[in-house]
Structure formats: C-alpha cells, structure tokens
Amino acid sequence: MHWINPPTEVEDLFGFIYQITNKLTGQSYIGKKQFHSITKKKVKGRKNKVTVKKESDWKTYTSSSIKLNEDILTHGIHNFEFTILHLTRSKQELDFLETKEQWQRDVLNSLQPDGTRKYQNGRIECVRFNKFTADKVRFV
C-alpha cells in the first residue's frame, strides 16, 4: 500500500480526501476516494433490491486524473507521495471536504515559484451545499 497514514479499520468510514505530490516537480493533486462501493442488486423472488457493499480498490488507487496516472507510469510510483488528509463518515462530508480543500488551496490558480502550476487539478466539482449539509459535517 502506498498511502501515508492509512486507517486500520474502514468499515464505519465512507471515504477520504487525499493529496498526491510528485516529488520531482512539486505538483500535487487533491481528490477523494470511497472505501466501499455500494450497489443494489435484484434478487429473484424478492420485490425489493438487496444492497451489496464491498471494499473498493482504495489501497492501490492512484487517481481518476489521466494526466497524473500517466506521470506515475512515466516517473514511477516511488516518486510520488500519497497522503490521506481527511477521513469521512458520509458522502456529504466527503464532497464538502474535497471542495473545501480545493478552494482553500486555490488548486486552479496556484503557481509554483518557477511559474508552473502547483496543482494538476483541472476542475473543482460543482456540488450544492447548504447550511443543513455544512452543519452535518463532522471531522473524524
């Protein structure tokens, strides 16, 4: 596993916010990942679908960013630092904290001293938040 400070037990957690940093260029990426995939399956003879929860590929996950994954293949995974920033207990908390981290770090505009982009993020998710959602967010 390549994650720094991974949780030992993920059963009661929903997901995490992460930062991946290229040690060669100093560029980073801020993203999110769920610990489990949850699907509803139809079962023969039953009216309602059954919820199936299984652990995701989070231990070996690198990113959904095509550019970042290309860089990892080119430079080797050992040249990247994978840090878990926050653990979350709900989808709302996961979405909120990812957006908050991306806005606070100004991932779309921040530059390194040499003028290159500091973050590889190309967008910030458009997620609707309201006071009710923000009040429900609890830090783990």
Positions of predicted regions on the chain:
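GIY-YIG nuclease catalytic motif and its immediate N-terminal context
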Residues: 1-42, 136-140
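Generic hydrophobic, helix-prone segments enriched in Leu/Val/Ile
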Residues: 14-16, 72, 120
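Generic alpha-helical secondary structure signal
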Residues: 22, 33, 62-65, 123, ...
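Boundary/linker segments flanking structured domains
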Residues: 1-11, 86-140
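Conserved short loop/helix modules at catalytic or binding sites
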Residues: 34-91
